[in-house]
Amino acid sequence: MQRAFNIASLKVTVIGAARSGLAAARLLHQKGVTVFLTELSPAESYPEAAAILANERIPHEFGGHSDRMYESDLIVVSPGVPSDAPVLLEAERRGMPVISEIEVGAMFIDGPIIAVTGTNGKTTTTTLAGEICKASGRNTLVGGNIGLAFTDALLVHPLPVDITVLEVSSFQLDTCVSFHPSTAIITTITPDHLNRYHGSFQEYVASKQRIFMNQNAQDNLIYSQDNPVVEHAVKTARARLFPVSVQQRLSRGGWRENGHLMIDAGFGGEVLVRVEDLQVRGAHNHMNVLMAALAARLEGIPIDVIRQAVLEFRGVEHRLEFVIELDGGTW
């Protein structure tokens, strides 16, 4: 993981006392970094965070942003803070670097990172990729925009981490500077959250493209070839490209063929599973499975381990889940 900052030598301001901001401040404080947290809302809005900050003696303020926040070398921003917030515009005017909580977590990870973004499918893909990595016996951290915030997970997860699997939102990517996943996945891109991007779909696409901006020819980028926006977006990538399709057979990446899911991560075409043996149904889930399996294979996990984890995967809670076939229907 390349690091743009020697964080230990810096004074850092964290904006926002919600879960990711609080976690970032706590992690930095535990690592010996001089940190200050500032929150616009009053302490009554975040009683648990206020108590934790006081108990752990982390300097902080609630109810507004004082000039103290600019007495630092670096600003860490929560994903809920829009890029055009006055405090961030002022930081930009002062020439202060601003990074995301995701990037803070990555500074304390040495192993490979699988990062997943996309409008739809990223939670299922992230969850399955994490399950596969765990099944391989690797010490696997799963977090980001799913479950625990990345820095929160690092507070409780035993170190060292062998491999990290992250769900990353466009909001988190907006302020990434040196974030460098060894394997990145873009599931889909369709219009979403455009109010955050001044109504511009192109700005939203550009945010998703940031997941691969620091990748090089030794890294991997998995993407949906069935989504024209994604297919066009990855043309600027420097990483090795691995397309995935459920509509056509491919020469590398992942695809459906004769009732099977197939992957080729550079080891030749490998049969992953029969579609009928999956516990998750639908073309969208076939795409998610192919992407997660391909990412794991690219990170060196044996195909038999991947296959077994895929067959056992029942999907994500509150998502579409197969129950039974009855009276000619699927429920």
What are the roles of these predicted feature ranges?
Residues 1-100, 104, 281, 308:
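N-terminal leader/targeting and accessory segments in enzymes
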Residues 3, 10, 15-17, 198-205, ...:
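Adenine nucleotide phosphate-binding catalytic loops in nucleotide-utilizing enzymes
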Residues 18, 41-43, 146, 227, ...:
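Residues in the short beta-alpha loop(s) of Rossmann-like NAD(P)-binding domains
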Residues 24, 125-129, 295:
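Hydrophobic residues within alpha-helices
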Residues 30, 68-70, 79-225, 229-238, ...:
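Phosphate-binding loop of NTP-binding sites
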Residues 34-39, 141-142, 165, 243:
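Short beta-strand "acidic-cap" motif of Rossmann-like dinucleotide-binding folds
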Residues 47-52, 113, 152-157, 321-323:
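Active-site-proximal loop->helix
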